[in-house]
């Protein structure tokens, strides 16, 4: 995968040289290029200006972005504009992006964008219902979530498939050594070696956690018959005061 990032602050992306994203680059699975669009700005390198019609703040000018895009060698890239007014970013969107060969992220700054910039864009995406100083942190988050889904980036291909949200549910609790730490013991079922009991326990815990913490996810979740039976049992137990 090839990723191009348009930003005023390329140095902010240093964390992408480490961890999973850095390893993907080392394996030759990922190529990232940073483009400071101030380098393409006319008018004394100014990238912003006052909005027509008045108003507070400054807008990112179209010219530096257009000229930077013209300089990028890309065939049919997915062009993502980081914008708090965009569609919310979700795991399913990361899975979709992981299938692309070329991605371009446009990181804004200031009050907003000249509307004409959006003619270059295929997707307007928001990290959430809040406003950041710039799009860099949002872009890094989306890139990390996407790159880890590229085949062969993670050690085990199945490891991301059980992550929270990948299945549509939150992930079940997990434990490692020691068995007993400060009086907190690993659930007996995980020590039993009985694979079917462990599978059912994990399913129940995943459904329960999702119901308690993110019930909105269950509104569109496609329950199997087995999950529906377990979920009904969970709701019944909770209504009777079960913890």
Curated annotation (Swiss-Prot):
Keyword Cytoplasm: yes
List of residues binding S-adenosyl-L-methionine: 108, 127-132
Keywords, alphabetical: Cytoplasm, Methyltransferase, S-adenosyl-L-methionine, Transferase, tRNA processing
GO biological process, one term: tRNA N1-guanine methylation
Compartment(s): Cytoplasm
Gene Ontology CC annotations of this record: cytosol
This enzyme's EC code(s): 2.1.1.228
GO MF: tRNA (guanine(37)-N1)-methyltransferase activity
Main location: cytoplasm
Name used for this protein in its record: tRNA (guanine-N(1)-)-methyltransferase
Species this protein is from: Streptococcus equi subsp. equi (strain 4047)
Species classification: Bacteria, Bacillati, Bacillota, Bacilli, Lactobacillales
């Amino acid at each position: 995968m090839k990723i191009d990032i348009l930003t005023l602050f390329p140095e902010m992306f240093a964390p992408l040289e480490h961890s999973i994203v850095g390893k993907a680059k080392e394996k030759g699975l990922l190529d990232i290029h940073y483009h400071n669009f101030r380098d393409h700005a006319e008018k004394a390198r100014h990238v912003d200006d006052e909005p027509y019609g008045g108003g507070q703040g400054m807008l990112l000018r179209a010219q530096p972005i257009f000229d930077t895009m013209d300089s990028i060698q890309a065939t049919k890239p997915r062009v993502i504009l980081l914008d708090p007014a965009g569609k919310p970013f979700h795991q399913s969107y990361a899975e979709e992006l992981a299938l692309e060969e070329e991605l371009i992220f446009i990181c804004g700054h200031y009050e907003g964008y000249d509307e004409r910039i959006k003619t270059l864009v295929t997707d307007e995406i928001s990290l959430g219902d809040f406003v950041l100083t710039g799009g860099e942190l949002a872009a890094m988050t989306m890139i990390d979530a996407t790159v880890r889904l590229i085949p062969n980036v993670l050690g085990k291909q199945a490891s991301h498939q059980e992550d929270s949200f990948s299945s549509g549910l939150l992930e079940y609790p997990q434990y490692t050594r020691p068995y007993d730490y400060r009086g907190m013991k690993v659930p007996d079922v995980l020590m039993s070696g009985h694979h079917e009991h462990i599978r059912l326990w994990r399913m129940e815990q995943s459904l329960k956690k999702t119901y308690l913490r993110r019930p909105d996810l269950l509104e569109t979740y496609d329950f199997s018959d087995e999950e529906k039976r377990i979920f009904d049992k969970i709701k019944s137990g909770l209504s009777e005061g079960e913890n």
